[in-house]
Amino acid sequence: MIQQESRLKVADNTGAKEILTIRVLGGSGRRYAGIGDTIVATVKDAIPGGNVKKAHVVKAVVVRTRKQSRRPDGSYIKFDENAAVILKTDGEPRGTRIFGPVGRELRDKKFMKIVSLAPEVI
């Protein structure tokens, strides 16, 4: 469960290493974000010479969560860390590579570019 003030690892090559959630998008009272949900975040840690800098406000999609999420077939999926991929304004990923596995829920939410770049879809 990702909520306001949650810190996530960045799973792409934009130059950001860690982001802090400012807001969960999708309704005025929405509190939690799961896999495939979009958030607004600020960059807390970045590498020098990267595409995004520290203190930039970005949109990102959650690709991994430590909290288990239930799938329609009754199975559960959870990961070892919370991670997100930074997006452009049109919803495409800003980076050109994705690191680590991503959840199958991204395919259902039409993030096909992220699914195709990911090394593994679980």
UniProtKB/Swiss-Prot annotation:
One of its GO terms (biological process) is translation. InterPro entries: Ribosomal_uL14, Ribosomal_uL14_bac-type, Ribosomal_uL14_CS, Ribosomal_uL14_sf. One of its GO terms (molecular function) is large ribosomal subunit rRNA binding. GO terms for cellular component: cytosolic large ribosomal subunit. Keywords: Ribonucleoprotein, Ribosomal protein, RNA-binding, rRNA-binding. It comes from the Bacteria. Part of the 50S ribosomal subunit. Forms a cluster with proteins L3 and L19. In the 70S ribosome, L14 and L19 interact and together make contacts with the 16S rRNA in bridges B5 and B8. HAMAP family: Ribosomal_uL14. Belongs to the universal ribosomal protein uL14 family. Binds to 23S rRNA. Forms part of two intersubunit bridges in the 70S ribosome. This is Large ribosomal subunit protein uL14. The lineage of its organism: Bacteria, Bacillati, Actinomycetota, Actinomycetes, Micrococcales.
